């Protein structure tokens, strides 16, 4: 079985490095992007198993990556991570097709969600 690759799209480099390190130490490959445009390009050109994106501020800027991901690769699960729970953004993300919406810095929940998706066969 190939190593699943997570596409991380975070505005803040510190968050990107933190979550990337957690994923790599848990056996995942990572592709890290600091902009929506870079994330969408990676979706279009690389073999991505799951997308993990920052909600962004003040509006749900990650929406662009979520929508584009589901258009290009509807089989790839998308997990949204937010600094604080915003019920409007949560409902929008779930309505658009995100598999989950977690508050930072809940790293253990992120790994639990990824492991659950792997067991379900989402990482083909």
Which ranges hold each PLM region?
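Conserved phosphotransfer microenvironments
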Residues: 49-69, 85, 89
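Conserved phosphotransfer cores of two-component systems
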Residues: 44-46, 68-75, 96
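Two-component/phosphorelay signaling modules centered on CheY-like receiver
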Residues: 12-32
């Amino acid at each position: 079985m190939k190593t699943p690759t997570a596409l991380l799209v975070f505005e803040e480099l510190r968050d990107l490095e933190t979550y990337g390190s957690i994923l790599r130490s848990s056996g995942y490959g990572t592709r890290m992007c600091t902009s929506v445009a870079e994330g969408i390009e990676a979706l279009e050109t690389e073999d991505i198993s799951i997308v993990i994106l920052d909600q962004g501020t003040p509006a749900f800027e990650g929406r662009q990556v979520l929508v584009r991901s589901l258009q290009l690769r509807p089989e790839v699960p998308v997990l949204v991570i937010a600094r604080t729970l915003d019920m409007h953004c949560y409902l929008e993300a779930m309505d658009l097709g995100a598999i989950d919406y977690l508050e930072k810095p809940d790293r253990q929940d992120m790994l639990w969600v990824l492991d659950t998706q792997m067991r379900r066969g989402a990482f083909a």
